[in-house]
């Protein structure tokens, strides 16, 4: 939306669930544009920090798009702090730095599910699966928007998780004491592959994730970035 506005397009309803776009017959101008930071990438690193029981600071998080995720995690027992807001380079996106601390989590009483903005982001929902593996009790994850994506959540069982598929949209996650290393072939879907990688970071021993194209297309230099904060990942080419 911000890019279109820089082209002179009028957009009503930014920040709501409904947009009204008033088009133009032609656009002929040069603009300099900075993309907004990615809330899904923020949630990836938050999830990785939680399951590895790490103290981790995740910088430049677009707070508007992960507020409900943080509130859910707070209710589950996550200890974290948030800096004052500051603007991204595009002068529109509100950013914060989030520092998470090792926490004892409990399963929420209510199910975790997505909703249109400002609800939990559809692509952030899978990150609650590895988190729920270490949250005492049982967590119901309801992935109602994607057909059969929840099936891939059970791949974490290969690492020692206890996840039961109730139907193509709902998975029941029972907490476990630990995960163990395993070899897993990446699913064709990006987010399920990402949560397998996150779970492997928390698993004891060595794991191997094969056929990683799906995650490479969604996360730039992910192995190198994780290694920079303490992971031990070797990319085999």
Named regions from a protein language model:
Residues 1-237:
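Short, structured segments at the rim of ligand-binding sites
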């Amino acid at each position: 939306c911000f890019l279109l506005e820089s082209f002179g397009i009028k957009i009503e309803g930014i920040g709501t669930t409904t947009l009204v776009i008033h088009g133009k017959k032609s656009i002929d101008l040069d603009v300099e544009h900075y993309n907004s930071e990615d809330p899904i990438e923020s949630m990836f690193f938050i999830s990785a920090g939680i399951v590895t029981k790490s103290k981790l600071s995740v910088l430049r998080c677009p707070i508007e798009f992960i507020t409900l995720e943080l509130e859910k995690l707070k209710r589950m027992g996550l200890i974290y702090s948030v800096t004052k807001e500051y603007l991204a380079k595009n002068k529109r996106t509100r950013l914060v730095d989030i520092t998470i601390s090792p926490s004892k989590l409990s399963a929420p009483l209510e199910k975790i599910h997505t909703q249109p903005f400002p609800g939990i982001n559809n692509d952030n929902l899978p990150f609650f699966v590895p988190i729920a593996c270490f949250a005492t009790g049982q967590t119901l994850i309801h992935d109602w928007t994607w057909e059969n994506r929840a099936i891939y959540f059970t791949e974490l069982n290969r690492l020692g998780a206890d996840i039961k598929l109730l139907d193509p949209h709902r998975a029941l996650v029972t907490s476990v004491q630990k995960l163990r290393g395993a070899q897993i072939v990446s699913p064709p879907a990006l987010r399920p592959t990402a949560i397998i990688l996150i779970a492997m970071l928390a698993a004891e021993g060595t794991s191997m994730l094969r056929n990683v194209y799906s995650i490479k297309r969604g996360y730039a230099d992910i192995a190198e970035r994780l290694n920079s904060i303490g992971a031990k990942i070797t990319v085999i080419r």
